[in-house]
Amino acid sequence: MSGRLIGIARRDRTRAAMEVVDRGEISPGEGVRGDFRGALKPGRNKREVTVLAREDWDAAVELVGRPELEWWNRRANLLVEGMALPRTQGATIRLAGGAVLEVTGQTDPCFRMDEIVDGLQAALTPEWRGGVTTRVLAGGPIAVGDQVECGE
């Protein structure tokens, strides 16, 4: 199954504003270059890069009556569209520039989502709607518009 990368975001510290960029770099042990979370727990980080599907985000914000809410409020690193994200640990997500991500689990929505909109945490909870956490197996450049493929 393939789709397209339509958003890249990063933040340099916890609770910092998300910086949305058109291109970037993904590397093992660092995640999305410039994002603080990817570099936590070197060699043991199961959350180097987080990926969110546009269709899942749209369903969640529709449920809370805020369809205009921007995706980066979810605090994910990558936004893809046109594909269902794998829901199996060990599945891979491959980006056109050569980066390969291994799914380590679902991104559990936290209480901070309700700080944005009441009910958003619950709207993101079912069916892995909050996205997936990944570990970087291979790095590479990324850019909005890149093709993305999933494998089990």
Pin down the residues of each PLM region:
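Metal-cofactor-dependent catalytic cores
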Residues: M1-E152
